[in-house]
């Protein structure tokens, strides 16, 4: 039994939750001033909680949609005979309908997504050339909105590393993602496909920044594809795409690492709910007398004109967030 002297030295047990927890820890560990440590921990939690909301929640929502897409595709694959295959006989027709509605909903809620100028996309085959943000999520929104609004399906050319990512085979197949040899692209266009490509690719995605610099280098293969397939080129740009997700590509070591191993190992941050508007420019018609170099320069100028017209440079995350509260532009 505890004696009266021992009881008097310990004093009363504290009544507040934090003080009581500190008291228990102090008695158990023998460490003094545990209440100060707990108070500091509570303060840190209070400070870091908004940061966790800003950085973790958007990523969690995105990956929830992505994993939901994969789950729906696996369910569809098992039960696809019970879904509508559509008039085209496409066995993935029902899956496409599910995915485009999921991603269009994500775009509407998270970015207030708008698509402008889709009347510039002809009913004939065409090659869409777009600026590549840090993430291709704006292309997903565009593809979904175009299919919902125009019933027009757009295929896209992706870097070879995408096809090596585990678990994406079905997702890639349903979204019409293609590996990009010139012959494959020309064949797809001659079959009547609408095809999208970003000449800047992964390098532009990782190492362009809020100045929206187009980083094509000497790439002109896309122009030769359009010439060989005898199709128009259509420029496309998404406003604020760099403010949605930022990269640390300005750090030289990441650029050197990419050039050595050609894998996109560059940290990203953000997933901010900024305003996204995709703008489709006027078509550059097929010209049998133009060279690939001339068509490349012409396309780059058209894309730069879209950026200059619709993007305030340098991009600003706060301004892009505030644009969510501006009057919604009427979609074409």
UniProtKB/Swiss-Prot annotation:
<dbReference type="GO" id="GO:0016020">
    <property type="term" value="C:membrane"/>
</dbReference>
<comment type="similarity">
    <text>Belongs to the diacylglycerol acyltransferase family. Highly divergent.</text>
</comment>
<feature type="transmembrane region" description="Helical">
    <location>
        <begin position="46"/>
        <end position="66"/>
    </location>
</feature>
<dbReference type="GO" id="GO:0046027">
    <property type="term" value="F:phospholipid:diacylglycerol acyltransferase activity"/>
</dbReference>
<keyword id="KW-0472">Membrane</keyword>
<dbReference type="GO" id="GO:0019432">
    <property type="term" value="P:triglyceride biosynthetic process"/>
</dbReference>
<keyword id="KW-0325">Glycoprotein</keyword>
<keyword id="KW-0012">Acyltransferase</keyword>
<feature type="glycosylation site" description="N-linked (GlcNAc...) asparagine">
    <location>
        <position position="289"/>
    </location>
</feature>
<feature type="transmembrane region" description="Helical">
    <location>
        <begin position="11"/>
        <end position="31"/>
    </location>
</feature>
<feature type="topological domain" description="Lumenal">
    <location>
        <begin position="1"/>
        <end position="10"/>
    </location>
</feature>
<keyword id="KW-0808">Transferase</keyword>
<keyword id="KW-1133">Transmembrane helix</keyword>
<protein>
    <recommendedName>
        <fullName>DGAT1/2-independent enzyme synthesizing storage lipids</fullName>
        <ecNumber>2.3.1.-</ecNumber>
        <ecNumber>2.3.1.20</ecNumber>
        <ecNumber>2.3.1.22</ecNumber>
    </recommendedName>
</protein>
<dbReference type="InterPro" id="IPR002123">
    <property type="entry name" value="Plipid/glycerol_acylTrfase"/>
</dbReference>
<keyword id="KW-0443">Lipid metabolism</keyword>
<dbReference type="Pfam" id="PF01553">
    <property type="entry name" value="Acyltransferase"/>
</dbReference>
<dbReference type="GO" id="GO:0005789">
    <property type="term" value="C:endoplasmic reticulum membrane"/>
</dbReference>
<keyword id="KW-0256">Endoplasmic reticulum</keyword>
<feature type="topological domain" description="Lumenal">
    <location>
        <begin position="67"/>
        <end position="332"/>
    </location>
</feature>
<feature type="topological domain" description="Cytoplasmic">
    <location>
        <begin position="32"/>
        <end position="45"/>
    </location>
</feature>
<feature type="active site">
    <location>
        <position position="132"/>
    </location>
</feature>
<keyword id="KW-0812">Transmembrane</keyword>
<feature type="glycosylation site" description="N-linked (GlcNAc...) asparagine">
    <location>
        <position position="5"/>
    </location>
</feature>
<comment type="function">
    <text>Catalytic subunit of the alternative triglyceride biosynthesis pathway, which mediates formation of triacylglycerol from diacylglycerol and membrane phospholipids. Synthesizes triacylglycerol at the expense of membrane phospholipids, such as phosphatidylcholine (PC) and its ether-linked form (ePC), thereby altering the composition of membranes. The alternative triglyceride biosynthesis pathway is probably required to provide the energy required for rapid growth when fuel sources are limiting. It maintains mitochondrial function during periods of extracellular lipid starvation.</text>
</comment>
């Amino acid at each position: 039994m505890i004696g009266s002297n021992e009881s008097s030295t310990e004093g009363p047990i504290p009544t507040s939750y934090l003080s009581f927890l500190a008291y228990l820890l102090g008695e158990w560990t023998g460490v003094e001033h545990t209440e100060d440590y707990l108070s500091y921990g509570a303060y840190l939690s209070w400070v870091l909680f908004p940061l966790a909301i800003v950085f973790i929640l958007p990523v969690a929502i995105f990956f929830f949609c992505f994993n939901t897409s994969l789950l729906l595709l696996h369910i569809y694959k098992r039960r696809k005979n019970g879904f509508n295959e559509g008039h085209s006989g496409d066995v993935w027709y029902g899956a496409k309908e599910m995915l485009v509605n999921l991603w269009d909903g994500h775009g509407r809620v998270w970015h207030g997504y708008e698509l402008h100028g889709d009347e510039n996309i002809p009913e004939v085959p065409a090659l869409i050339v777009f600026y590549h943000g840090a993430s291709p999520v704006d292309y997903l929104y565009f593809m979904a909105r175009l299919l919902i609004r125009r019933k027009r399906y757009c295929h896209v050319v992706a870097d070879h590393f995408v096809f090596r990512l585990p678990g994406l085979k079905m997702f890639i197949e349903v979204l019409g993602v293609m590996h990009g040899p010139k012959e494959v692209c020309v064949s797809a266009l001659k079959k009547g496909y609408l095809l999208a490509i970003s000449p800047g690719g992964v390098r532009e995605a990782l190492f362009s920044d809020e100045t929206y610099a187009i980083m094509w280098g000497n790439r002109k293969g896309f122009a030769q594809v359009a010439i060989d397939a005898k199709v128009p080129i259509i420029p496309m740009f998404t406003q604020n795409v760099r403010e949605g997700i930022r990269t640390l590509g300005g750090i030289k070591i990441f650029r050197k690492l990419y050039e050595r191993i050609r894998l996109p190992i560059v940290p990203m941050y953000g997933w901010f709910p900024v305003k996204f508007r995709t703008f489709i420019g006027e078509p550059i018609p097929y010209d049998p007398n133009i060279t690939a170099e001339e068509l490349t320069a012409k396309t780059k100028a058209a894309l730069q004109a879209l950026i200059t017209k619709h993007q305030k440079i340098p991009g600003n995350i706060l301004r892009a967030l505030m644009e969510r509260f501006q009057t919604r532009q009427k979609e074409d």
